[in-house]
Amino acid sequence: MSEITLPEYQSIAAELQSASLAVTPAELHGLLVGMLSGGLAINDQTWQPILFDYTNDGMGWPTTALAFAQTVFKVTANELTGSSMELSLLLPDESGEEGLFALADSLSDFVNHFISGLGLAGIALNNASDDAKEALADLEEIAKLGIDEDDDFGEQAQLLEQVIEHVKACVLTIHAEFGARPESSESKPTIH
């Protein structure tokens, strides 16, 4: 059985644009990761009406765009609930200076929409652990970051990679506290 992976960034971007949906792949992924990390159920379709309301004034998505979103949701749910502690981010993979700017902007979009997704899932942060509060505070700061045109691009690319890894750690920290878990496949003992 082959493992399902996130769709390629450019193909999903083209599909979202052709469907006239004003959301980027990074924003879509951030929103879904945020909703899942906020405790949204992983075994039903309750995420779709929330997505439609947030991105398309409550209107459903065209079939192909929705299929991309379903794939992103499924891959993300599997990663977040798996034992590997790995998280893939749906970010552009372009080279050069323009690619670095696009990557930084997309990371900011992902983080902003992750935070929105947490809100849409309705988590109560007042009872959150210090670790979760710190992770969220870090994400709020990361959302404001950008690339300085006057600094060394090679150094900034390395720093951005470190920031991306920190974003993943923050997301996993928040999901560990608030995220939904898959229902156990182990059957409970029958008492006679």
Swiss-Prot record:
Name of the featured protein: UPF0149 protein VP2588
Family, similarity comment: Belongs to the UPF0149 family.
GO cellular component, one term: cytosol
Source species taxonomy: Bacteria, Pseudomonadati, Pseudomonadota, Gammaproteobacteria, Vibrionales
Highest taxon above the source species: Bacteria
Stored HAMAP family: UPF0149 (MF_00346)
SUPFAM superfamilies recorded: YgfB-like
Pfam family, one: UPF0149
